Amino acid sequence: MIPLAFGVGSALTALVGRAVGAGDWHTARRTAWVGAFLALLIAGTAGAAVGLAPMQFASLFSGDAEVVAIAARALSWVGPAFGGFGLGMALYFASMGAGRMRWPVAAGLCRIALAAGGGWVLANVFGMGLDGHFLGVALGITAYGVVTALGVRQGEWPGR
């Protein structure tokens, strides 16, 4: 997912930065959202495919039945969250162009906290085992997209 989101995001850094430099915050936000929805669509489509056929995708990377089974479990949980990653990554780069990095950094911290801490709680406290860790990662990825998106709105990108 990183190459896809990076391709969109790196262009957003320049496009948003140019609009911000011209003092056109409306265009900066609009450009950020168009790019973010493009990344969401691309990553979400890939994630849906992975989530719907996890065994087939896992089999591309290993012939070991146990490895494929565990990888397929992970992909079935995490695949549907790929769209959130695309959204978050694209808006991260757009925020960099706007010079507004507080929300994307907070989003990254939320992602880590949910993936590691939330995954541990789900796995151990709620007894979900390995699936709890995978769900924690999916929740972290989703939160990354949502929290980053919260930072790209008029109240946060109003101008200087």
Where are the regions a protein language model picked out?
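Short membrane-interface helical motifs at transmembrane helix boundaries
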Residues: 45-72
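Transmembrane helix-loop junction
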Residues: 18, 59-60, 73, 97, ...
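Hydrophobic alpha-helical transmembrane segments of multipass integral membrane proteins
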Residues: 41-44, 80-83, 87, 113, ...
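Residue-level recognition of transmembrane alpha-helices
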Residues: 32, 39, 75-78, 82, ...
